[in-house]
Structures are given as structure tokens and as C-alpha cells.
Amino acid sequence: MEKSTQSKSKYSIILGVAFVWFTTHFGGGFASGAQIYSYYVRYGVWCLITPAIAMIYNAVFFAYCLYFARKHEVYDYRSYNNALYGRFAPVFSNLFEVLYICVMCVAPAVAFATGGATLSTLTGLPYLVCTLVIGVFIFIVAIFGTDLVRRVASVLSICIIVGLLIVYIPNIIASSHEISQTASTMNSDAFPLGKALYSAFLYGTFQLANVAVFVQHARSFDKPKDAVKSMGIGCVINIIMMTVVVLGIMTVASNPDMAKQSVPTLFMVQSGVGSRFLTPLISVLIILGAVSTAV
């Protein structure tokens, strides 16, 4: 009985950390479809495979970092960098410190702005009040440490995944013919593979800065090898959800007005099925995406 309980706890931690990766990756740009369109769909039919390449690239990097952190018991990014870079730590640890400060300024700012604006649109409350609500929620979750962050990440991930599937699957099914036509058009246009791979590389590399917030979760692993399992699961989750978003955006990618859209997902919903119900749901997902990234 005790072994069974320990096994369940072990796998819940592995899954929880995988969800931390997903919620960190899933921000307002992901929810709105803007990032997926800019980095993938714009580069033609290669968008069906390049998200997987980017996430595998991330998974290898994150798995090694978490494995290293657990093996050497370094659970804050400064100690981790010092151990990783060795005699080069005085240079690279300090460079990473500057990078991390920049990221920590930008990520919450984007969360406050995106979440506050969307919440204001949904509720009609003043923007500043909505921004304050978002900020208080993020602050409360953050001050209670990594255990609460991991639990919140798991709950948010389930809500986000279910929400994305509700939004995208009906539109993908209803517009499967448009997806086929778009893929054929993309294929005939012969977009260069090199540019598509480079864009995916840029997207994946930008995500690597998240390692600073990941290493603290390595403490919860029973063994260093659990990091590999966790990031493997996270990789599969991210690939599936990114592919779903790609297919959804492909339903409207051939529309001449698509290039003007700042929120491709909203344009997809308004052009597809169930817009009355799905439009507010997309707004909620954008808020959850902004909050999950900041947390």
C-alpha cells in the first residue's frame, strides 16, 4: 500500500513538472495564435512538422538541465549556472543574471497587460482594476512556493487543454476541406525548408530562458532520471497542442484578411462554427495563458 502511494506521488510529480513546462510555454501569444502563425504557419506546409522539431529541441535541453540540477542538487538558477559553467561561471552566470532580470520584467508585464485588457473586455471593469486582480492572483500563487505553482500549473493545464480542444476541434472538423486546400496551396508555393527550420529554431531558443524557473522543480524528483520522463511527457503535450493550433489556423490561413489579424484564433472562431460561445472562451484562454506564463 505504501509503495503504491509513493508510486502515485512520484508520477504525479513527474506529470506536474511536465504541466509546469506547458503552462510556462502557453502564454497569451500561444492562446491568441499569433506566435504559431508568425513562427510556423507563415512558412508553409512545413508548419505541420516544425513545431515538433522545436519542442523536441526544448525537451532535450530541459531534460538535461533538470537532470543536472537534481544530480548536483542545485535548485536555484544561480547555483545551477555556477555548477554548469564551472570556471567560466563568472562570465556566463552573470550574463544569464542580466538575461533573467530582463525576462522577469517582460513576462509579468505582458501577463498584466494581456490579462488585464482581456478581463476588462469580458467584464466591463476598468483596465487598471482588472490588471490589479491579475497581479494579486499571480502574487498569491508565487509567494507560496513551487509546490503550489506545480498544483496550479496542473489545474491550469487541464483547463487550458480542454478549452483549446473545445475551441479548435469543431472548427478543424468543420473546415477540414479548407485545411486540405491550404496545405495544397502551401505545398505548391514551395516555401523554403531552411527558413521554416530557422524560424522554429528561433522560437525554441527563445523558450530556453525558462530553464531559470524550471530548475527549482528538480528538487521534487525522486531520481535525476525522472527529469527525462517528465520532459518527455511535456514534449508530447506541447507538440499535440501546437499541432492542434496550427491546424486550426490553417482553416483561415488562405483568407486574404488573415495577414491583418493580431489575434488569429479569434479570427478563426469568428469565421468558423460556434462563434457566440467560443469567442468569450478564447478570451478566457488568453487570460489563463497570460497568468500561467507569469506564474
Where are these regions (language model features)?
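Juxtamembrane transmembrane-helix boundary signature
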Residues: W21, A52-R78, G248-N255
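Extracellular/periplasmic helix-exit of transmembrane alpha-helices
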Residues: F62-Y67, A174-S180, S199-L202, A218, ...
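Transmembrane-helix boundary/entry motifs in multi-pass membrane transporters
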Residues: K3-I13, R42-L48, K71-V103, T121-Y127, ...
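Hydrophobic alpha-helical segments and their helix-loop junctions in multi-pass secondary transporters
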Residues: G28, I101, I138, A142, ...
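Membrane-interface loop-to-helix entry segments
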Residues: V110, T114-A117, P126-I134, V141-I172
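Hydrophobic, small-residue-rich membrane helices and short re-entrant helix-turn-helix hairpins
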Residues: E2-Q6, G33-S38, F144-V155, A212-I237, ...
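Hydrophobic, membrane-embedded alpha-helices of multi-pass small-molecule transporters
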Residues: Y11-A31, T50, V103-M104, N171-S176, ...
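Extracellular loop-to-transmembrane helix junctions
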Residues: K8-S12, Y39-L66, C235-I239, T243
